[in-house]
């Protein structure tokens, strides 16, 4: 077992270094660059799997594969990386989705070297976000990750690409200022100056300061997840992005917000989390219902799926605020599940647009008659999105519902209301998804569209990509332990720590978190 091998550093730096070689590769038509990038992606994903198999213990809740190299010793600033149950499944997801996104980018012919350079740089940057254990380093990789996304949106996007890219960078960069302010405050608080996340988490912050820090982080990560009302950049970004960018936005970037909420808000500020938990639940319900209703009203296919993503992220908020093992486990599983399902749907949006050259549902209709493979893929992936039993979304949402329903941190009235409203959102999901399928595939034929000579069925590359995404979607739905065992040890430990901060009185006089006036002015110390 190669426990001393720098697995995570290699995984992060390999695609970045490989991207620097792209400008010197002789290539006229882009074919060499495509294959080179795909091979780099496959090798890096293989290294991720090797690291998981040889150096990661699923029963250990602590950080593993830890590396730490001095950077600025005077400030205890290090290149520090590690992986636990919160980060390892998302690192694997990143490698998987990004490699498929590189394959999805096969039709890109405009400036292919620059495009694949940005894709590979983003590959390493995304994994760095999930692996780094230094607050300042986290802020740096969080910011650097924005640059490739902005360039891909602004260069290869649609007609309103500059507007969408500018809105994306303004929202996300503005939110990042709150990360920097909170990180510096935590690092310089107390007698020791340190940016190490584990050291920062052990500091005894004043309770009111915890609340301010939690609010700052929440604003920053609410943009990325996204959470209403800081979500408006996402439909615009998806509306102008290409298929590979779609896959990375839905599959990876949104999960960065959920991961950071768990890692920093819940993990480092558990006392404040106990106070903000009802707010997260309410925001989660708003996300589910509002986005589902808005998605139903959309006539643009990309924007419809984008609002669907926002709706599904609401379950992540409810699960992480449930204070139960199964609820928190469901939140993590929902992030993984939606990463796969969202990537598949947006890839199909791109494949459909390449053939029909329209995103307006009113201009579609009857395309399933000529594209039977596309018809089958759209139907299957939509069933996964509406949480059909036997698929990953069903398991994740049921776990969140059960976790919240069995939580003793909330009053019965509040739980019933939340579950009822969330169920309304769940019911709305098949309504807008099935109506979408009808308008694309089953509706009256658009003669100009159906008779168009380029309206060809899915090619083997497209079938392969969707097949690769459906295998884990169905696999998790049938046997969720294949994924939950990776993170269960960590989420159980985190839940126990969070419950220590919940002012619950055992017996008939227990305090519900929905009554904030009954919370103590200072939460109990973490044992």
From Swiss-Prot:
GO biological process, one term: electron transport coupled proton transport
Localization (cell): Cellular thylakoid membrane
Known EC number: 7.1.1.-
Transmembrane segment boundaries: 5-25, 35-55, 90-110, 112-132, 136-156, 168-188, 211-231, 242-262, 274-294, 310-330, 331-351, 386-406, 416-436, 463-483
One term under GO cellular component: plasma membrane-derived thylakoid membrane
GO molecular function, one term: ubiquinone binding
Catalyzed reactions: a plastoquinone + NADH + (n+1) H(+)(in) = a plastoquinol + NAD(+) + n H(+)(out); a plastoquinone + NADPH + (n+1) H(+)(in) = a plastoquinol + NADP(+) + n H(+)(out)
Keyword entries, A-Z: Membrane, NAD, NADP, Plastoquinone, Quinone, Thylakoid, Translocase, Transmembrane, Transmembrane helix
Main location: membrane
EC category: translocase
Highest rank taxon of the organism: Bacteria
Membrane topology category: Multi-pass membrane protein
Record function comment: NDH-1 shuttles electrons from NAD(P)H, via FMN and iron-sulfur (Fe-S) centers, to quinones in the respiratory chain. The immediate electron acceptor for the enzyme in this species is believed to be plastoquinone. Couples the redox reaction to proton translocation (for every two electrons transferred, four hydrogen ions are translocated across the cytoplasmic membrane), and thus conserves the redox energy in a proton gradient.
Similarity annotation: Belongs to the complex I subunit 4 family.
Protein name: NAD(P)H-quinone oxidoreductase chain 4 1
Organism: Trichodesmium erythraeum (strain IMS101)
């Amino acid at each position: 077992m190669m426990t001393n091998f720098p697995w995570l550093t290699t995984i992060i730096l390999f695609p970045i270094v490989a991207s620097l070689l792209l400008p010197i590769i002789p290539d006229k038509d882009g074919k060499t660059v495509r294959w080179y990038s795909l091979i780099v992606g496959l090798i890096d994903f293989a290294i991720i799997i090797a690291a998981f198999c040889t150096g990661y213990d699923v029963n250990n809740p602590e950080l593993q594969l830890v590396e730490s190299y001095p950077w600025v010793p005077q400030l205890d600033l290090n290149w520090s990386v590690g992986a636990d149950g919160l980060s390892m499944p998302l690192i694997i997801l990143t490698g998987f989705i990004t490699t498929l996104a590189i394959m999805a980018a096969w039709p890109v012919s405009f400036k292919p070297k620059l495009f694949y350079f940005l894709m590979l740089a983003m590959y390493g940057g995304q994994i760095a976000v999930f692996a780094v254990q230094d607050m300042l380093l986290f802020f740096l990789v969080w910011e650097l990750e924005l640059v490739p996304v902005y360039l891909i949106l602004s260069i290869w996007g649609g007609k309103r690409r500059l507007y969408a890219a500018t809105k994306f960078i303004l929202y996300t960069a503005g939110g990042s200022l709150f990360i920097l302010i909170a990180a510096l405050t935590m690092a310089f608080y107390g007698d020791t100056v340190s940016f190490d996340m584990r050291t920062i988490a052990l500091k005894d912050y004043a309770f009111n300061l915890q609340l301010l820090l939690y609010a700052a982080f929440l604003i920053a990560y609410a943009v990325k997840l996204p959470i209403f009302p800081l979500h408006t950049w996402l439909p615009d970004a998806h509306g102008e992005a290409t298929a590979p960018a779609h896959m990375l936005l839905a599959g990876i970037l949104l999960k960065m917000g959920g991961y950071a909420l768990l890692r920093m808000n819940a993990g480092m500020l558990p006392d404040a989390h106990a106070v903000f938990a009802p707010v997260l639940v309410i925001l989660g319900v708003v996300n589910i219902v509002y986005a589902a209703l808005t998605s139903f009203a959309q006539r643009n296919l990309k924007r419809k799926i984008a609002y669907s993503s926002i709706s599904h992220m609401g379950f992540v908020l409810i699960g992480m605020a449930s204070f139960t093992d199964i609820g928190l486990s469901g939140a993590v599983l929902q992030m993984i599940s939606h990463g796969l399902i969202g990537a598949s749907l947006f890839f199909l949006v791109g494949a459909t647009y390449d053939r029909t050259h329209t995103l307006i549902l009113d201009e579609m209709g009857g395309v399933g008659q000529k594209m039977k493979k596309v018809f089958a893929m759209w139907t299957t992936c939509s069933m996964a999105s509406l949480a059909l039993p036997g698929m990953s979304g069903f398991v994740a949402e049921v776990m969140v519902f059960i976790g919240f329903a069995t939580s003793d941190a909330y009053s019965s009235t509040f739980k019933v209301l939340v579950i009822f409203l969330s169920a309304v959102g769940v019911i709305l999901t098949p309504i807008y998804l099935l109506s979408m399928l009808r308008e694309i595939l089953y509706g009256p034929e658009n003669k100009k569209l159906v008779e168009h000579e380029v309206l060809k069925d899915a090619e083997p590359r497209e079938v392969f990509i969707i097949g690769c995404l459906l295998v884990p979607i169905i696999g998790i739905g049938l046997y969720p332990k294949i994924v939950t065992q990776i993170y269960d040890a960590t989420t159980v430990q985190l839940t126990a720590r969070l419950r220590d901060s919940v002012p619950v009185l055992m017996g008939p006089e227990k305090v519900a978190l929905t009554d904030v006036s009954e919370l103590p002015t200072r939460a109990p110390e973490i044992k």
